[in-house]
C-alpha cells in the first residue's frame, strides 16, 4: 500500500463522515457521493495497475459511468424540487409526490 492509496482511502473516509453528518442539503449529499464514487473508481484503477489486471480498470469505468448517471438524475430532482418549493432541502422531497 503506497501513499496514493492511503490518500484515497482518507478521502473516502472523509466522504463517508460527510454523509453521516450532513443530512439536509441535497447538493452536499450529491457532491459527497460523487467524491466517494470517484475515489472508489481511482482505487479500482490503482489496484488493477498494481495487479496488472484489466478488470479493475473496467470497474473504474463502470463506476465513472454510474456516477455520471447518478449526478444527472440527482440534479434533475434538485431542479424540480427547487421549482416546486423554492427550497433545496431533503426534508421537502415528499412535496414532489403526485
Curated annotation (Swiss-Prot):
Superkingdom as given in the UniProt entry: Eukaryota
Enzyme Commission number(s): 7.1.1.2
Residues passing through the membrane, by range: 1-21, 26-46, 61-81
GO biological process: ATP synthesis coupled electron transport
Mode of membrane association: Multi-pass membrane protein
Gene3D superfamilies reported for this sequence: 1.10.287.3510
GO MF annotation list: NADH dehydrogenase (ubiquinone) activity
Catalytic activity: a ubiquinone + NADH + 5 H(+)(in) = a ubiquinol + NAD(+) + 4 H(+)(out)
Keywords on record: Electron transport, Membrane, Mitochondrion, NAD, Respiratory chain, Translocase, Transmembrane, Transmembrane helix, Transport, Ubiquinone
Predominant subcellular localization, coarse grouping: mitochondrion
Known function: Core subunit of the mitochondrial membrane respiratory chain NADH dehydrogenase (Complex I) that is believed to belong to the minimal assembly required for catalysis. Complex I functions in the transfer of electrons from NADH to the respiratory chain. The immediate electron acceptor for the enzyme is believed to be ubiquinone.
Matches recorded under PANTHER family: NADH-UBIQUINONE OXIDOREDUCTASE CHAIN 4L, NADH-UBIQUINONE OXIDOREDUCTASE SUBUNIT ND4L
Family: Belongs to the complex I subunit 4L family.
Protein name: NADH-ubiquinone oxidoreductase chain 4L
Source organism (scientific name): Dictyostelium discoideum
Gene that this sequence comes from: nad4L
